[in-house]
Amino acid sequence: MGFSGHHARKRFGQHWLLDESVLQRIIEAADLQSTDRVLEVGPGRGALTERLLAAGLKAVHAIELDRDLVQGLRDRFVVQPGFSLHQGDVLEAPLELSDGRIADKVVANIPYNITGPLLERLVGRLDRPVDPPYQRLVLLVQKEVAERIRARPGHSSFSALSVRMQLLARCHSVCPVPPRCFQPPPKVQSEVICLEPLPASERVMPDLAARVESLLKQAFLARRKMLRNTLAGVAEPNRLKDLAASAGFSLQQRPQELAPATWVALARGLNRGD
C-alpha cells in the first residue's frame, strides 16, 4: 500500500512539505551526527524521514497520527536500519524510542493547531522544563508563532511566549517557508526555527519559575498598559517602585519592553521580600 489514494486531511492540519531546498535546510539545521537518535513528529508521506535515514543515524523514531499513512510509511521504511514508527497523538504518545531511550534531537512539521501544547511537551514550562532536555529541536511552525518565539524586547511580536521560550532555550530562525512549498498550500506563511534547550545550570531556578510565570500572566493580560497598572497589587507601590529600579526598568514601561532576564530579576526581588 502506498500513498496514491490518500489526500491531506484538514482535521489533522496536514500540509506536506515538498520543497527540496527547505527539506535540506532542516537537515542541515539539525546538525546530525551518526550517533544521534532522532524523534520525528508528523512524518506524513516520509519526505523528511527519507533524508533522516539517509544520514545514517543511530535511530529515527516517527510518530504519526493518521492511521491511513502509517501502513505506507511502514511499507516504505520498515527495512531501513534504526527506523521505528508509532501510530498515535504526539500529545499523548510515549516519546521514548523503541529501545526505551530518549531521542537526542527532534525534527517536526508541526500541525499549527497543536503548536502551543506540543512546545510545552517537547520543551516544557518554566516551572517544569523537560529534563533531560533534547539537544536541539528543528521545527516547522506558523511564521507568526516563530516571530513571537524569537522576538526581542520592544518588538511588536514580543510576548509572554517570547519570555518563556527564551528562558528555556536559545532560539533562532533557519529559513522562511512560503505556502508554495507545501501540498496542499496553507493559507499562512511558515518558518523553520531551531531551539537549543538550555542546560539546567542556565535555567530559571524552580523557586523563581512560578513567580516569573505569575508575573507574565498578569502583565501581558493588558500588554498595552504601563507596568505601574498591570503590576499593581504584586507589591506595595513604593516597594514595587524600588524593585523596578533594582531590576533596571521603569514602571512607565510596558511589558513587551522588558527582557527575559529583567522578569527574572523582578521575581527574585519579590521572592526575597516574601
Curated annotation (Swiss-Prot):
The record's section on PROSITE patterns has: RRNA_A_DIMETH, SAM_RNA_A_N6_MT
Name the reaction it catalyses: adenosine(1518)/adenosine(1519) in 16S rRNA + 4 S-adenosyl-L-methionine = N(6)-dimethyladenosine(1518)/N(6)-dimethyladenosine(1519) in 16S rRNA + 4 S-adenosyl-L-homocysteine + 4 H(+)
In the Enzyme Commission scheme, what number(s) does this protein have? 2.1.1.182
Q: What are its GO cellular component terms?
A: cytosol
As for family, the record states:
Belongs to the class I-like SAM-binding methyltransferase superfamily. rRNA adenine N(6)-methyltransferase family. RsmA subfamily.
Q: What does this protein do?
A: Specifically dimethylates two adjacent adenosines (A1518 and A1519) in the loop of a conserved hairpin near the 3'-end of 16S rRNA in the 30S particle. May play a critical role in biogenesis of 30S subunits.
State the name under which the record lists this protein.
Ribosomal RNA small subunit methyltransferase A
Give the organism, scientific name.
Answer: Synechococcus sp. (strain CC9605)
